Amino acid sequence: NAAASPDWLDAIARVAADETLDPAFRALCLRLPAEDDMAQTLHAAGHVPDPQAIYVARRRMGKALAKTLAPMLPAMIDRLTDHGPFTSNAQTAGRRALKLAALALQSRNDGGQAAQAIYSAANNMTDEMGALACLLDIGKGQPELARFAARWSADRIVMDKWFALQITYAAPEKTAEITRALTQHPLFDWKNPNRFRAVIAALAGNHAGFHHASGAAYTLTADWLLKLDPMNPQTAAR
């Protein structure tokens, strides 16, 4: 229940504002630690990790950091947005990573307005998926999900990511419900190992949702593994 450390917030703010630092490094610093990393740190310190408490603490950290960086985030995102043709190299990749890290925080401040704009203007998959993730993370993005599916429905690899993204960013109390709905989607083929993993593995990867007190995710996972095991025991075992 502790608040985010003022020293941590100040340190991240200094890194965010320092234009002499490598953009890729600044992006890493702006990203919140993964829930799995937080759980491992707690376990190593002799504590029993609580997925729900970790989820709440991480959300609180994100809110505090977004508030601290609020004065600089819009200008940072604008500076890092390349309006010319897409180029792929280490420098531009670092700029995109920093832009999306800043966008994830800004989405907590502006309700997703900047993310919607970047999604609409995206000329590369990194920006498109990244902006969509930012929207899903704040409980929005349904129109963008529909547009994404309409555009990429014929690309299996991309659609695997579309399925997984929705579950990865689902709120704990909605994770099982969203996963169940996706297993009823016309493009969900449980006999396709990659599509099955994109959905069920993503469910297991959403720790707070998977371990929700309702037990709904446990039941859903068990039902699907029992169905898959006779046909594809190797995938079921994974």
Which residue ranges define each predicted feature?
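Long, ordered, helix-rich scaffold segments
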Residues: 1-238
